[in-house]
Amino acid sequence: KFSKNFSALISSKKCVVAADTRPSGHIIVETVKAGLMESGIDVYDLGVVPTPITFRESRKYGAGLVVTSSHNPIEWNGLKMIIDGIGINNKQLDTVIKDQVTNKSKIGTEHYIKSDYINDAAKIIGKISGTPKVTVDVGGGAAKTVASELLKKIGCDVNTINDDLV
């Protein structure tokens, strides 16, 4: 229901979707994608990525939705809704909460994408001289998909720990 109502705010008819590593994330993402596509929104699935990457990508596509619950207990989950790189405001939240009539003339399409974040960040940072040895504790979070890869790309010898806690 919430993703269908959220679709009323998406003028671009495109939305990036992502999740953190919580066990319930996958099933919620699939439900969210179905609601968006049923409402005519083309969905671009980033998979598991940190929330800021979804905010960044939402500026390209017009909207974003992250399934996450940040620092709450692991059994909790929620939806962060984004329009043009900014979390929705109270007026937009009212639209999401109230039932909306959505355009069902076309079904949206589903795409699996990868953000250019790592390449873009590596260009800004540049190569590190030498090959420093770095251990990264990602704590089982969504950074597990980017932290080690970025450090390797800029020239570090990376040892990743705690990448699969959930």
Predicted regions span which residues?
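An N-terminal, well-structured beta->alpha segment
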Residues: K1-A34, E38-G40, G108-V134, A142
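Gly/Ser/Thr-enriched, mixed-charge loops and adjacent short helices
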Residues: E75-V166
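N-terminal small/polar loop signature for handling phosphorylated ligands or for N-terminal nucleophile
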Residues: K4, K14-W76, E149-V166
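Short, electropositive, low-hydrophobicity segments enriched in small/polar residues
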Residues: K1, V29, T51, T68, ...
